[in-house]
């Protein structure tokens, strides 16, 4: 998981700090949530590091930016959506 640290409205780019998840990879499904934002799903693509360089993997403890179709607010949380691998589920 991570947290939004900035949003650049003129280019619709959100900057995040990855603080709990070991890494985010290109193609990961992401969920961004916030009190005003609600729940917004997107896919990790065209990620850039703090220096503005394109990256396919962002490691824990780093800042990164992604383009979004929605306004993201400082403090919004980002999570990776992964399928539930619980094969013992009795649903």
Set out the residue ranges of the language-model regions.
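Beta-strand/loop-dominated core regions that host nucleotide or nucleotide-derived cofactor-binding catalytic loops
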Residues: 1-91
């Amino acid at each position: 998981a991570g947290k939004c640290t900035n949003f650049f409205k003129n280019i619709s780019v959100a900057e995040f700090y990855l603080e709990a998840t070991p890494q985010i990879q290109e193609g990961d499904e992401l969920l961004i949530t916030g009190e005003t934002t609600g729940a917004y799903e997107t896919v990790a693509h065209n990620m850039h590091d703090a220096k503005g360089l394109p990256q396919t993997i962002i490691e824990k403890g780093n800042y990164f930016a992604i383009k979004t179709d929605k306004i993201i607010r400082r403090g919004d949380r980002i999570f990776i959506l992964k399928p539930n691998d619980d094969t013992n589920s009795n649903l």
